[in-house]
Regions:
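Conserved catalytic/ATP-binding subdomain
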Residues: 6, 71, 102-105
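Catalytic-site or vestigial catalytic-site microsegments of nucleotide-handling domains
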Residues: 6-13, 17, 21-38, 46
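Conserved helix-loop-beta segment at the catalytic/binding core of cyclic-nucleotide signaling proteins
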Residues: 14-21, 40-73, 82-87
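Catalytic/regulatory signature loops of cyclic-dinucleotide turnover enzymes
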Residues: 20, 85-91, 109-130
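Residue-level recognition of strand-loop junctions within catalytic nucleotide-signaling folds
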Residues: 34, 64-68, 97-98
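A structural signal for short, well-ordered beta-strand segments
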Residues: 61, 92-94
């Protein structure tokens, strides 16, 4: 599902509350790209799982993965890389509940910090820790 950016905080907060209650994980991948937004945002949602939520913003695409830990997020990132096969310069910031934040703001901030670091790395860089 593709959502609008204003819904991002609400949906992340909802997923965190659910994960906390059932003692599960939630991961967020922030995907940065150098492709024009309209083109990327029209293609990228086709790559994500039906159960994931995608929010396209000026910062990139936030992919929220319920019941997915950090290693599961890395598997998804490999799928994204294979789909684009080097045709798009992708970089990734990953954050997971409960390890990287307990609120929507904390999780989103962690993903943004990590994407910022990934942007200074090579094409396809993935940053999972601060």
């Amino acid at each position: 599902m593709v959502g609008k950016a204003p819904d991002l905080d609400f949906v992340v907060d909802y997923e965190i509350r659910s994960a906390r209650r059932y003692q599960r994980f939630v991961s967020m991948v922030l995907v940065g790209h150098e492709t024009p937004n309209e083109k990327f945002h029209s293609i990228f949602p086709d790559v994500i799982r039906d159960s994931d939520e995608c929010f396209c913003t000026d910062h990139g695409a936030f992919v929220l993965m319920g019941e997915t830990d950090g290693s599961g997020a890395l598997i998804a990132i490999d799928r994204y890389k294979q789909f684009f096969e080097g045709s798009v310069d992708l970089r990734f910031g990953v954050a997971s509940f409960p390890f990287d934040g307990n609120t929507a703001d904390e999780l989103i901030s962690a993903a943004q910090r990590r994407l910022s670091r990934a942007k200074s790395g090579d094409v396809g860089s993935v940053v999972t820790t601060d």
